[in-house]
Amino acid sequence: MIPYRQLVRMSHLAARFVGGADVHVVDPLVDLRNVFEQTDQLKIALECRNLTVDVEKVKNEYDEWFETYQKWKQADKESISQLKKELRAKKDGLLNALALPNLVHHAGKKQTPLLKPSKHAQYLAQQGLMRIDKQNHVVHLVGYPVVVQKMIREQLVDLFPGCQPISPSYFARAAILEALNIDQSTCIPFTDDSSHFPLTYLVGNSLPAITSPFLKTSFGEKNEWPISVQCTGASYTEKKNQVDLGNARQRMKHCALWMSKSAEELEGIINDANVRVGAYLDEGLDLEVKVREVRGSELKNYESQAFVVENRGLSLSRISRIGDYVSKRLNIQYSGSPATEKSEKSDGFVQMVYVETDIDRILARLVDDLIEGKEPPKYIRDAIKKSF
């Protein structure tokens, strides 16, 4: 059975049907019958992620909830109150179903390469270019690393000229994290210490941040497709054991999101992103990188497929195929032409691809190369000279 902690997490996403004090933020698609029509694929998605779930029990509980939901939608004033109580009594049926991960489009078979330890932290600290705040698990840079960091940020933005720059909020409600099926224990909770403040997290530039502006959005026919946006800046996670550029709780990242009307179009977007990011890191920064399709056990709950661009076992960039898993939960749709005698109505939930590149990890590997005697590209050397 799905762990209870996951059921509790989904209560914010399904606040409308659960009751209690949770804030109603999101209206996810609750007709999940098509998920259970693909039982074999669902079992594969669970097994490859090492999740033990009684699929039949989840399905039966959900069917009972959905049957009550359909009655509630059509109920008259006399019976609607009683049916609402029944919905809340059977809420586990919905919460269990919402806790299920995305189906798997394709998974790789290559083992995760051995991670080569980085020496950048000790080197930069000795040079007086980095200070490690062990209490808050963050690092502070000065001097040329800041120049290189800024340069990489600008170049990554230029790498995707078709992506519209946005400045999303650094905060996300619990319902947004649940819609993405992200483990909240990896995020930093935020509060103003008032009793009525809703459960909120500091996420910075991330998938929750870049998708939140489109919550409950319906794109019209006049939009140019695919719709693509990007943002860059600090990203935040909970504390880790190691504090350096690769593991600090505050790291500089570049994020890009594509939304398409066609699942078939995602393949081209993914291939293009793999080529652009891989070529930039390899040819632009002279880093030895390899693109690897991740195994099923490495997939995040919202991913159906993912590729990582790695340098000596360290992931520098991740390209995620999401499909319509997130858009159905955040209610992000597109509307098109109405139905005619010759064609069906053209509307649905958008298909997504998400690319996240860790700028601080790139900087760490550039410093590692420098320690080993490898010179950085000339334009980086020139930029460093100008900064002095």
Regions found by a protein language model. Name each.
Residues N34, E64-E67, K110, L115-F388:
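TRNA-recognition modules of translation machinery and tRNA-sensing kinases, especially anticodon-binding
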Residues I2-R131:
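N-terminal alpha-helical targeting/anchoring segments
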